[in-house]
């Protein structure tokens, strides 16, 4: 599933892929034939709300069995979700869609976007060579947001700076480096 998620994440950078991935229905160029995404069509037919699934591709292999790679929209943020080894059983049909929706609902109920650093926050300072002053503050250029558990502890967030010394003259808004943000050791 991880490999499929990485492939989907990469493919979503291609506009043509997104156009096909997001479409629910296709019509042939001569207008004679139509295709629908059966996995979504059958779920909607059985009154399953699939609105959080913005795009998807289903498949089957003997190894992974029924799979669904999808793009979920949860509170206006997009997540790639891949489920595999899904099996229909008595009372549990549309397994790949239901598994995907269960994961999406879990994310919606337990995670949210947190603004962890506001724009123009002083984060550090760097040395300046040949300047009238020997250091300058490093300020964030924009708000920094992250998807975190609803009950996260701010002390679990750590920052790792990759800063470089600057040489005068220093221009306003000159980039001084980068910063990695970690939540409980996960970047």
Which residues make up each language-model segment?
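Domain-terminus/edge residues, biased toward the C-terminal soluble/receptor-binding domains
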Residues: 2-187
């Amino acid at each position: 599933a991880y490999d499929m998620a990485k492939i989907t994440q990469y493919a979503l950078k291609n506009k043509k892929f997104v156009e096909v991935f997001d479409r629910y229905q296709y019509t042939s160029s001569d207008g004679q034939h139509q295709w629908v995404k059966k996995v979504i069509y059958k779920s909607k037919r059985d009154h399953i709300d699939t609105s959080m699934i913005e795009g998807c591709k289903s498949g089957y292999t003997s190894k992974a069995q029924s799979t669904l790679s999808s793009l979920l929209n949860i509170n206006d943020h997009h997540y790639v979700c891949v489920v595999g080894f899904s099996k229909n059983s008595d009372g549990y049909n549309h397994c790949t869609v239901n598994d995907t929706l269960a994961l999406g609902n879990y994310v919606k109920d337990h995670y949210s976007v947190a603004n962890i650093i506001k724009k123009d926050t002083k984060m550090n300072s760097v040395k300046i060579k040949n300047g009238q002053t020997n250091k300058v503050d490093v300020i964030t250029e924009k708000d920094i947001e992250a998807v975190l558990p609803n009950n996260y502890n701010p002390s679990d967030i750590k920052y790792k700076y990759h800063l470089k010394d600057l040489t005068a003259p220093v221009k306003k808004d000159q980039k001084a480096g980068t910063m990695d943000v970690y939540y409980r050791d996960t970047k």
